[in-house]
Regions:
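Loop-to-transmembrane helix junctions at the membrane interface
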Residues: 55-75
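Transmembrane alpha-helix entry/boundary detector in multi-pass membrane proteins
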Residues: 5-9, 25-45
């Protein structure tokens, strides 16, 4: 992964982590009894975003890949359940509506991150550059 791509992913996950953390802290501390499932999902998503940001920053590629895969599954499951069983989601989470309240960034970001992370792992090592042979 190139430096600019890495910095952009770290920044995106850090900002989303801060936003989700702020939202979930308010939800959990003020009205957890009203909608425990959505608010706990918000808290889990916040922790996941922070973990992914740290993993990208520290170069923990496998942790970042697993984290973004879990994120994508979470967005798809919560987004689908929000439409199929709206009674489970009396209030919004970061992932409700496939992240529509956040401009669908929660849906697009893990796809982009997985493409970048998985493509970066398939590059040939520098010492494998083919040299002309005699």
């Amino acid at each position: 992964m190139n430096a600019i791509g890495r910095i952009l992913l770290i920044a995106a996950y850090a900002v989303l982590g801060l936003a989700a953390t702020g939202r979930s802290v308010v939800q959990i501390t003020t009205k957890l009894a009203d909608a425990p499932l959505p608010y706990l999902v918000s808290g889990a998503s916040a922790l996941l975003y922070v973990l992914i940001a740290v993993a990208l920053w520290r170069g923990w590629r496998r942790v970042a890949i697993v984290g973004t895969a879990v994120e994508l599954v979470g967005v798809l499951v919560v987004g689908t359940l929000g439409y199929a069983a709206p009674e489970l989601w009396p209030d919004e989470t970061v992932w409700t509506g496939y992240g529509s309240a956040y401009g669908w960034v929660p849906l697009a970001l893990p796809v982009i991150a997985l493409v970048v992370l998985l493509r970066g792992g398939r590059r040939a090592p520098d010492d494998a550059v083919s040299a002309p042979t005699a």
